[in-house]
């Protein structure tokens, strides 16, 4: 319980820092951060039904946590303490559509949210883990989404635009229904993700 609460505290501080320093050209991005800050400022109940589960890509988790920059050591240390308690998942909507290689090299975990380790009904906060040289095909969802790259270099695409390089500490915001794709280039990628808005509707492949 203590490790989960520390994670909640650290991401709360992290999102407050983004709110203070980012220039908001998108009002939904500002609203999203407000929702994250408000929700992680509250007392949250421990989910007694939360069960540990691993996926094949978890073979990269240790090195991905180790590669988190020192400036985010609070988050990486809390993840180190939580890593053996996490329920890693895959999106069932992708079954029989994405390749077997994708499912060997992608997974996400919800730490705060309706089904997270800490229960919160109106946001989802967790991790995305991608293996080496994996392509995550274009997909979209109604929820607002923010990715904060913790470790690894990757390429990200919005709509049909060119892929752009994203490095550790970069932030990527996806408005509702914006198609996006990503691919890794020789190293695993660990990212903090957050959802707000229509969080109970899963992502769908395009």
Residue ranges and their predicted role:
Residues 176-200:
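Ligand-binding loop in jelly-roll beta-barrel domains
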Residues 1-6:
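Intrinsically disordered, low-complexity terminal regions of plant proteins
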Residues 8-121:
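A short, N-terminal "cap"/entry segment at the start of jelly-roll beta-barrel domains
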Residues 131-132, 141-160:
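Glycine- and acidic-residue-biased ligand/ion/polar-headgroup-sensing regions
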Residues 202-205:
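Long, compositionally biased interface segments
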Residues 107-114, 123-141, 162-163, 175-177:
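Conserved short histidine dyad/triad with adjacent acidic residue
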Residues 146, 159-179:
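Short acidic-glycine-tyrosine-enriched beta hairpin
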């Amino acid at each position: 319980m203590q490790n989960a609460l520390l994670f909640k505290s650290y991401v709360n501080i992290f999102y407050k820092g983004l709110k203070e320093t980012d220039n908001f050209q998108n009002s939904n991005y500002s609203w999203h951060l407000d929702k994250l800050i408000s929700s992680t400022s509250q007392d949250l109940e421990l989910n007694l039904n939360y069960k540990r589960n691993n996926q094949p890509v978890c073979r990269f988790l240790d090195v991905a946590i180790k590669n988190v920059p020192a400036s985010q050591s609070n988050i990486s240390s809390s993840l180190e303490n939580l890593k053996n308690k996490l329920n890693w998942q895959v999106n069932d909507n992708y079954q029989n559509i994405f390749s077997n290689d994708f499912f060997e090299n992608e997974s996400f975990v919800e730490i705060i949210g309706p089904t997270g380790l800490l229960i919160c009904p109106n946001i989802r906060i967790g991790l995305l883990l991608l293996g080496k040289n994996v392509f995550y095909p274009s997909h979209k969802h109604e929820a607002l989404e923010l990715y904060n790259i913790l470790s690894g270099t990757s390429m990200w695409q919005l709509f049909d635009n060119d892929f752009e390089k994203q490095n550790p500490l970069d932030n990527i915001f996806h408005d509702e229904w914006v198609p996006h794709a990503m691919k890794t280039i020789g190293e695993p990628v660990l990212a903090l993700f957050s959802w707000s808005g229509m969080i109970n509707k899963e992502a769908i492949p395009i």
